[in-house]
């Protein structure tokens, strides 16, 4: 698990998204810390007014400078039929370029609804991340 600090409340926040019948994919985001802006292992996301992800990227230059960016927490929930649909999708260029599976879904027009947590969760994506966690 690369998200060892997830708690029950974080899972519940994603589950709560599904009270809206239009939600087919849910995920968790948190405020982006300044120290993470240039870290390519931290996936950034911007959202619209309905908390639907507009774009995911490892790099800040992919976003409009005026838009607020969030840190993506790598956990998803899906409706069963959506999961079967996602399995059938073709890989996209942006997914391959950034190594982010969620770009395939965005490229194929699936909405990813985001729940915001104020918790700054530490993900383990690199050896540096692991060392940081082991020092805690």
Residue ranges and their predicted role:
Residues 6-93:
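Conserved core of the sugar-phosphate nucleotidyltransferase
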Residues 1-4:
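The conserved acidic donor/metal-binding loop of glycosyltransferases
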Residues 67-136:
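Conserved alpha/beta core of the MobA/IspD/sugar-nucleotide pyrophosphorylase nucleotidyltransferase superfamily
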């Amino acid at each position: 698990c690369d998200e060892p600090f997830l708690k029950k409340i974080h899972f519940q926040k994603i589950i709560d998204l599904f009270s809206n019948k239009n939600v087919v994919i849910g995920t968790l985001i948190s405020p982006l810390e300044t120290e993470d802006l240039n870290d390519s292992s931290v996936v950034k996301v911007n959202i619209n007014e309905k908390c639907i992800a507009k774009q995911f990227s490892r790099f800040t230059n992919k976003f409009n400078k005026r838009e607020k960016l969030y840190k993506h927490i790598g956990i998803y929930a899906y409706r069963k039929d959506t999961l079967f649909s996602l399995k059938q999708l073709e890989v996209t260029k942006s997914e391959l370029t950034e190594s982010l599976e969620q770009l395939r879904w965005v490229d194929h027009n699936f909405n990813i609804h985001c729940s915001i947590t104020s918790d700054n969760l530490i993900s383990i994506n690199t050896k540096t991340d692991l060392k940081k966690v082991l020092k805690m």
